[in-house]
UniProtKB/Swiss-Prot annotation:
InterPro entries, per the entry: L-rhamnose-proton_sym_RhaT (IPR004673)
Protein name per its UniProtKB record: L-rhamnose-proton symporter
GO terms for MF: rhamnose transmembrane transporter activity; symporter activity
Gene (UniProt): rhaT
Primary localization: membrane
The keyword Transmembrane helix appears for this protein: yes
Native source organism of the sequence: Shigella sonnei (strain Ss046)
Cellular component GO terms, alphabetical: plasma membrane
Membrane spanning stretches: 4-24, 38-58, 68-88, 101-121, 137-157, 175-195, 214-234, 259-279, 290-310, 323-343
Domain of life the protein comes from: Bacteria
Similarity comment: family membership: Belongs to the L-rhamnose transporter (TC 2.A.7.6) family.
Role this protein plays: Uptake of L-rhamnose across the cytoplasmic membrane with the concomitant transport of protons into the cell (symport system).
Location relative to the cell: Cell inner membrane
């Protein structure tokens, strides 16, 4: 396995670790509605950081974006909005199926759809089937899916042991939402594929290869921001128990505390895709679709490890932890299989 591929896998792991940890600061926010907290974090992660970093990278910010036609920018934006819809469905999936089943189904579907639809759309799927390296990477995707399933099973055992149930368990509604979440969340993978002309243009301007994908985040995350912020602001305006004014009428130290923690959560959320861009840059072009598989499977892996570190699995017994550990090992094996396949 080449150093470039190894570093690509490593950066995807770092990004996934940030994704697995980003919600920790949000949990310490006090006396704010989820909508206000999510909006503040989202403004940081979807608007302020993408725009600021792009302004630092590009020699002429406005000239860069104005150089693209609407036919180039619109698909990137719409796929970003598609991913934003997946974000909202994610929370509803947890509500009706519970954390473990919801995450397992949603992540499993988005892993498959986001990974395999890109080569199918680009007309390259036959290359994967007809080459040794392609078949090896497909095997890695399958093994990763098995690993996600094992970790999901561990989560179910944990919830059963701890007596945790879905807020409003509804299998039919939950499955529909999980499928929708999985499909729509893959919009980020599709957006990265559609943004290739933007990456090439950034490279032509002398932007370091590790950073060429970052300017496209202004458009991708702009689409996601409109969906997420629109959802939050509508709820803040219409739901009687929610009030943006009330959230910002708290004592000043508490407001500062909440803003800083929400901003930190937003920063950590953004860093997952900052390092995703680094990993994506190191993956061979013919296998760039594998970036999504690495990100999603590592997200599940890191989520399990973070849970162990935070002692969330204490008092659950040996079996859930053993199953979780097995799932994590399978995901690590999958990453190695994919790496070997790309090297071939």
């Amino acid at each position: 396995m080449s150093n470039a591929i190894t570093m690509g896998i490593f950066w995807h792991l770092i990004g996934a670790a940030s994704a697995a940890c980003f919600y920790a600061p949000f949990k310490k926010v006090k006396k704010w509605s989820w909508e206000t907290m999510w909006s503040v974090g989202g403004i940081v992660s979807w608007i302020i950081l993408p725009w600021t970093i792009s302004a630092l990278l590009l020699p002429d910010f406005w000239a860069y974006y104005s150089s693209f036609s609407l036919s180039t920018l619109l698909p990137v934006f719409l796929f970003g909005a598609m991913w934003g819809i997946g974000n909202i469905n994610y929370g509803l999936t947890m509500r009706y199926l519970g954390m473990s089943m919801g995450i397992g189904i949603a992540i499993g579907i988005t892993l498959i759809v986001g990974t395999l639809m890109t080569p199918i759309i680009n007309g390259n799927f036959d290359v994967l089937i007809n080459t040794e390296g392609g078949r090896m990477t497909l095997l890695g995707v399958l093994v990763a899916l098995i690993g996600v399933g094992i970790v999901t099973r561990a989560g179910q055992l944990k919830e059963r042991k701890m007596g945790i149930k879905a807020e409003e368990f509804n299998l039919k509604k939950g499955l529909v939402l999980a499928v929708m979440c999985g499909i729509f969340s893959a919009g980020m993978s599709f957006a990265m594929n559609a943004a290739k002309p933007m990456h090439e243009a950034a490279a032509a301007l002398g932007v370091d290869p590790l950073y060429v994908a970052l300017p496209s985040y202004v458009v991708i995350m702009g689409g996601g921001a409109i969906i997420n912020l629109g959802f939050c602001f509508i709820r803040l305006a219409k739901v009687k128990d929610l009030s943006l004014k009330a959230d910002f009428s708290l004592a000043k130290p508490l407001i500062i505390h909440n803003v800083l923690l929400s901003a930190l959560g937003g920063l950590m959320w953004y860093l997952q895709f900052f390092f995703y861009a680094w990993g994506h840059a190191r993956i061979p072009a013919q296998y760039d679709y594998i970036s999504w598989m690495l990100h999603m499977s590592f997200y599940v892996l890191c989520g399990g490890i973070v849970g162990l570190v935070l002692k969330e699995w204490n008092n659950t017994g040996r079996r859930p932890v053993t199953v979780l550990s097995l799932g994590c090992v399978v995901i690590i094996v999958a990453a190695n299989i994919v790496g070997i396949g790309m090297a071939n």
